[in-house]
Amino acid sequence: MKRFLHRVKWPLLLSSIAVSLGIVAVACAQPNSRTIENLFRPSSAFTDKNDGSINATLYKALENREGLTQYLTMRLAPVLRNFYEENVDDDIKRNLRTFNTDTDNSFVNQEQNLRNQYRGDYLVRLQTDILDNTGGNQANWKLRDVNNKIVDDFINKLFTKNFVEYVDKSVGVLSTPLKGLIENQSNWNNIKIQAKFVDKNKRLRINNDAVYAAIQDKLLDQFVTNENPNLVSRVVFTNETPNDGFDNYFNPDLIKSPTPSYQFQVFNKYNQQDNSIKGANGFHILASNLQSYVNTNNKTIDIPNKFSSDSGGKLLLKASDMFDTFDPSFSAAFIQGYLALQKKSKGAEQTEYTKLEKDKSIIENFFVENNSAKAAMKSASSSSQTTTVHKTDLAKIFKENETTKSTDVFKGEYQKKFSNATSTSNSDSSNNSAIVDLKELKKDNNSQPDLILARGKDGIHLMGVDGGGYYLSESGRDVNKQKQFLLFRALQTKYGLIDTNTTYDFKLFDEVKKHFDKNRVLFLFNALFKLVDSKESNFLSFPQFKKFSDSIITVKNELKDLVESQYQQIVFNEVATAENKVALKLAERNQPFIDNERNKQIWMNGLAAVLPYEQDSKTGHYNELGIYYKDIIDKVSSNTSNSNSNSNSSSSDPFSKKIIDKLKENKKKVEAAVKKHVDELKVSVIPSPQYSQIILVDTKLSSDPRNTSLALNLALNAVLSSDELQNTIRRDYFVNDDQFKQAIDLDKLTFKNWNSLNNENWNIFKYTYLFDLFQKQANPSIFGNGVNESSTDNKPKINGVLDSLYNSLNLEERLDSNDLINYYSYLYTVQWLLKDNLKNLKQNLQAKLSRTTNSFLVWSLASDKDRNNTASQAMSVSSSKSVLVKMANNVASQTNQDFTKQEQQNPNYVFGSSAYNWTNNKTPTVNSAANDISSLYYTKNNGSSSTSLTLMQKSAQQTNNQQRRFGFHGIVTNTSSNNLPDAVRNRLFTSFVSQSEKSSSNGGQAQLQSTQSSGSNETIYKGALFSFGSLTKLIETIDNIPTQAEFDALYNHLTSNLNINVTGVDRSKSLQEQKTNLKNFANSNFNNTQTVQLKQAQSKTNNSNFNDVFSRFEGYIGTNKTSNYSSYNFLQDNQIYHAVYAKQINLEDVSMLGSDSLNSTDSNNSKRLDLSLEEFLSTVALEALNPNNQTQAINALIANAKNGLVRVGDNRLFSAISSQWVRKF
């Protein structure tokens, strides 16, 4: 305490004005001594670990996005200050003075507010609450505030004016360019971003525009490169209510009150007598003059707005937000047109149309001949590849799903077109129609498609990439030409040089600013550095801006590598995020159609069609649509001073692989640039101000030491409370735990042969964790279905799906992420449960299991008994009902295969629909009627247990084959049921012996003796008291009951849950007498050594089946309990069938756990809960997911850390992380 009081007498680092104010304040009031005692004492390092050093923490700060922004802002501000200080515009100079004045006043007001609120403690609160977070002292607070004002003001000035002009080589900027001049494609290189009336040889106010215009130009370069923006000319014909009513198209018995929508897309027919320019008549005019809207000279596309149901015009589609902003069908169709212009189209029907059907209903353009359910698609790499399913055969789909319907989905012409299932007149005709969602249109057979006709949720769109024919070609995207074209359109709108019938609103630099605002300072630095490197003349050569220019060059020399590497990394990450939205938004688009199938209302999908874009079965990405995004990555990579790549990617790699390789490669560049920069600054720790609780740093080796030191401190402030830095501390515990490292390779995240377990054993833990994560995903179909495209097996491979999910986490690279710490915590819990001969697992299970209630290992699957299986043909099932339903109705296949051992290929349509194949997956999965996707979670047993084999398997003597059983829920107790359905949980714990079982006569389906295999002596009460283990344990339990409430609980469990007719217990007697009576009942009824006469006497009390109440029950539980599947009756709950397999365990089983439990060569399953090794490890894996077990394990990790708790030297970090992980220096 004495030393600390001495330290707080250090002088506060203030300006001369602040010093006088501080003296007056101290004279008026002194802080409370307890307030001072409670202050955190900063040290000279952030933690006592190597990665807690000053430099290591600064590395983290400058790799962190917010930390980098804070740092670069303070480095940018002094550069811009030179622009303000030497400016000839008095208004700009005055702005700088105003910033300083406003900042001074703001500080005074803030200080007074704290004085009023905290009185004597206000100086402490000023330091801890305000100054510690803003550079450490008053001078830095003010410098930071002024710097932020300078940066904000300069950026606002950047976009005040529109500098897009036509620049004649002879006369300069034309004040009023002619329409014909700028529409000439050969003149587009004269359209520039250039300020008017500037003169580099004079000191003029107007010369400031040269600064703004030059920076605008570079920001536009960034925008065009990073966003790949394309203007799309389009009109829409919105969905209509037909004049003759929906009932003439769709069956009103099935489709009640349809509304105009994508599914029920109907348009009124063309009427030659109607002079309207909207709807079908407008479409007729449009289709008759289609190619007149495409200018073959300058490649512009202008479609008259008058035909559109909305205002028409053009839309700017950008990589970052088009799938958020627009209908995903529309955005995907745009990409299709974009790729078609580069001959990279893979999605549209192979036939590219030169004309439209204009004399009928608009929708009929999407009815195509259906000689085959498959139509060829063009490949991006080879026009000879034709493998993609595209046409949607509605007749086939409805036929497969609606054999029980006596009426057609369609009526009138639609019925004729699609030859619906129950239409016998032409259902087998070769000329019935299928439906598509998109058509490519071209002028003639010798040209590329330049227009797209596409269906969307709001109507039908005719669209084309405006100018795409100019800057897109087979060799790719020409970014410079794309920029020229956008400037051409921007110049048109600026000067109103647009035909009145094709007007549109296009504010190019509003879009540029929107892109710029995402990363303002980093992008501005990048633009300034590009200007330094530019060969074109710009403001940097103006004598008027010499000081400003020199400061840009100086800071470029210091920050170039840092800015360039971080710029690339941020752009790569944003493009990756944008591309991920493709699968996500298309999944959202498809979900209602899948739901209709799942909910037995497939007819509600109406005219919905599969989008013509293939989903990669393995990754879930749409690789062809990803070409659009891959182009951005390539352009950004090539647009740097050091574009040499060590990436393993090839040009043919899909985006999903290329982006991962690029991010990994560039991450190393970021780390190297950050380390080099920080090390060169030779940062040191400086004394903390009075009352401060933080570490402050300083550098003398920068071109601007004061602002650089402030920048470093603000970067630290941003990162010290971040998850990333906290996770660095947490990770330190894991990587320094010797036992954990013996089990896990923490660098590669692979498993070692620890505790007799091999890699295959360890994978059970990995995939259990991933499956739990998979179940929590809102759109799991975005991870594909795990099917290898070269495989002939069309079943989903769940491990392949989980691998895709694991790859998306990118844990090997994200070492400070929450995802990694969560995975570490789980794996450590596994290791903690298994170490020391399973001591911790044993203790936890002893606490989890109870003597007084049964516990089970449970496998459970569920199915809607009325749910149709839309892929029944693929499953070779004649009926449309699900396999589970067929079994429940005792019409299972002749092999009598156990349902819980059948892999559910697509439970609850989790991978979409194979009938429609909405994701257009190359290897669609077969639908399953199972509701519960836990059917994908399987365990293996070695087949040695006779009760787990079917009769067929027994007769074939297949006792050594490893069997799979699906729907594993692990250890289930009455208080921990692991998401079991209510019906299953109630059957196990509140009606293990049901009244129907008890009252059923011999020969009834529920009485077990009549349904067992020959020689079976099982009873309906088998296992009822298995939790007690023996009669002796039951008597001990009764003896040890201390209260009436506990006795009542046991009594009610026996009589209500187990349906045992307990006799001889007078509930009005004392607790001791009731206990004695219950023990007498137990001894006389549950003792296997009693005489035959006693057993015969017991039959009169309906308790004749008590001889095996302490035996383990293992088998199927439904309306009956049986160990043989052939006699099993499913558990029913309203519309749901449940297939349940259960195995009892008790505390005696737990007591057997020990050193031999993990021995794969030991066939004695009694040492591992009577389970195979694989089943046992799956059980442990689920226990490791338990939050309570993880908490215990992490507490043990921290408590046993060989170096004790991590010591922290800065209050910001100490306050951010839980105190269980750290202590003060």
From Swiss-Prot:
Keyword terms, alphabetized: Cell membrane, Lipoprotein, Membrane, Palmitate, Signal
Phenotype caused by lack of the gene: Probably essential, it was not disrupted in a global transposon mutagenesis study.
Keyword presence, Transport: no
Lipid-modified sites (S-diacylglycerol cysteine): 28
Chain segments carrying region Disordered: 995-1014
Record membrane topology: Lipid-anchor
Cleaved signal peptide residues: 1-27
Main location class: membrane
Lipid-attached positions, N-palmitoyl cysteine: 28
Subcellular location: Cell membrane
Gene Ontology terms: cellular component: plasma membrane
Xref: Pfam families: DUF3713 (PF12506)
Family statement drawn from the similarity comment of this UniProt entry: Belongs to the MG307/MG309/MG338 family.
Protein name: Uncharacterized lipoprotein MG309
Organism this protein belongs to: Mycoplasma genitalium (strain ATCC 33530 / DSM 19775 / NCTC 10195 / G37) (Mycoplasmoides genitalium)
